[in-house]
Curated annotation (Swiss-Prot):
Protein name: LexA repressor
InterPro entries: ArsR-like_HTH, LexA, LexA-like, LexA/Signal_pep-like_sf, LexA_DNA-bd_dom, LexA_repressor, Peptidase_S24_LexA, Peptidase_S24_S26A/B/C
Site, Cleavage: residue positions: A101, G102
Keywords: Autocatalytic cleavage, DNA damage, DNA repair, DNA replication, DNA-binding, Hydrolase, Repressor, SOS response, Transcription, Transcription regulation
SUBUNIT field: Homodimer.
Function noted in UniProt: Represses a number of genes involved in the response to DNA damage (SOS response), including recA and lexA. In the presence of single-stranded DNA, RecA interacts with LexA causing an autocatalytic cleavage which disrupts the DNA-binding part of LexA, leading to derepression of the SOS regulon and eventually DNA repair.
Family per similarity comment: Belongs to the peptidase S24 family.
Residues annotated to bind DNA: 29-49
EC assignment: 3.4.21.88
A Pfam family matched in the record: LexA_DNA_bind
Amino acid sequence: MQNKINEKQQKILDFLNEQIEKNGYPPSVREICNAVGFKSTSTVHSYLEKLRKQGLIQKDPSKPRALKVINNKKNSKTDEPKNIYSGKELVEVPIIGKVTAGQPILAVENIEDTFPLPLDFVQNSTVFMLRVQGDSMIEAGIFDNDYIVVKQQSTANNGDIVVALIDDEATVKTFYKEKGFIRLQPANKFYDPIIVRDNLSILGKVIGVFRKM
């Protein structure tokens, strides 16, 4: 039998159910924070942990950012999922606001928010998301203000679309290793390739794109 929950816990559950019914996946920690009126996302994490202990949500202990929401029939308007995300185990993927040389990409101070993605898409990789600025990759289907999903890795193969750090500035381009230099190729005929001989760091490989309609 579940323990009695307080008003804030109920608000979180109601918001989770509302967003799952509307979108098919749970909201981000930041969205929960704003909806319930908390000042800090750490408070949300604390409440989510209490709900997990009460059996109302599930977290995979081997995957710290994985979250599985348990269907709460008392608060849900329907028992039927609206789309394929419902009932799937999800991973809260960090959205990176700033990339800084010499600092780990997933440093807490770099994370602006999180976004839930299906675990079977992310698998066991370490992934993060970035918002694209500019139109240099439009011919590859990556547009201004899109969110790219990036698998963190420090190497790349020719033809991979990567996030690279050059002189403290992140760029999204197609990677090519040439004789004596690296060519970062844009996917827009109006842009020239970037030729790099040193001071280049590969932050990851782009594995997906999300766009707000």
